[in-house]
Amino acid sequence: MSSIGTGYDLSASTFSPDGRVFQVEYAMKAVENSSTAIGIRCKDGVVFGVEKLVLSKLYEEGSNKRLFNVDRHVGMAVAGLLADARSLADIAREEASNFRSNFGYNIPLKHLADRVAMYVHAYTLYSAVRPFGCSFMLGSYSVNDGAQLYMIDPSGVSYGYWGCAIGKARQAAKTEIEKLQMKEMTCRDVVKEVAKIIYIVHDEVKDKAFELELSWVGELTKGRHEIVPKDVREEAEKYAKESLKEEDESDDDNM
């Protein structure tokens, strides 16, 4: 069967003869062309890191963020089309707010992930709409449930993870994440490793400038999702650059 759409890619409600929905695959392609985002769950929380590419020197520092607060206890990291991601962040916030209004307590992350995944999936069923061109991770921490991390892709499937990467360098990032002993690490340890992984997978040839965005939610923040403090972020970036330099020197010695 041909891998080219040839008419079967005009609508998200049409299957190709070999059982593929091309519009959903194209949406996933938009995620694969985006900057890398990673999320790591550890014993006392969840840490997010995003490689936010700076496409112009004229951009104001800190603009076009790819990390969002969904609720006090839930954070979100995105890859793909930023406008689509913002729309889904608003949907997730609405779900969390409605749940608290109805039941009087914070929404469990699995329930939130399932609800938003159902919404994303609905946009793959009709010809009048297009799939969302973004993937995103949701992370939270509570005393009862501990740390939790979920990823939702453009097809509307929700996965639970210990460590996850989305975006153009996801495979390289996953390889680095697999080397970590996540169940034994704390958020403070993981922040450094997240920064290091983002620096390792960043392609300096194609994408020169980038901003590192870091956030965490865990015991350290009393269950609130917060941007990593500036001094901790700078320390993590310093560790990442030094580790990268050491690896380059060891490679030169081995040649």
From Swiss-Prot:
Listed GO biological process terms: proteasome-mediated ubiquitin-dependent protein catabolic process
Tissue distribution: Ubiquitous.
Chain positions with Phosphoserine modification: 243, 250
Protein keywords: Acetylation, Cytoplasm, Nucleus, Phosphoprotein, Proteasome
S-S bridge residues: none
Subunit record text: The 26S proteasome consists of a 20S proteasome core and two 19S regulatory subunits. The 20S proteasome core is a barrel-shaped complex made of 28 subunits that are arranged in four stacked rings. The two outer rings are each formed by seven alpha subunits, and the two inner rings are formed by seven beta subunits. The proteolytic activity is exerted by three beta-subunits PSMB5, PSMB6 and PSMB7. Interacts with AURKB. Interacts with CDKN1A. Interacts with MDM2 and RB1. Interacts with the C-terminus of TBXA2R isoform 2. Interacts with DNAJB2.
Protein name in the entry: Proteasome subunit alpha type-3
Organism whose genome encodes this protein: Rattus norvegicus (Rat)
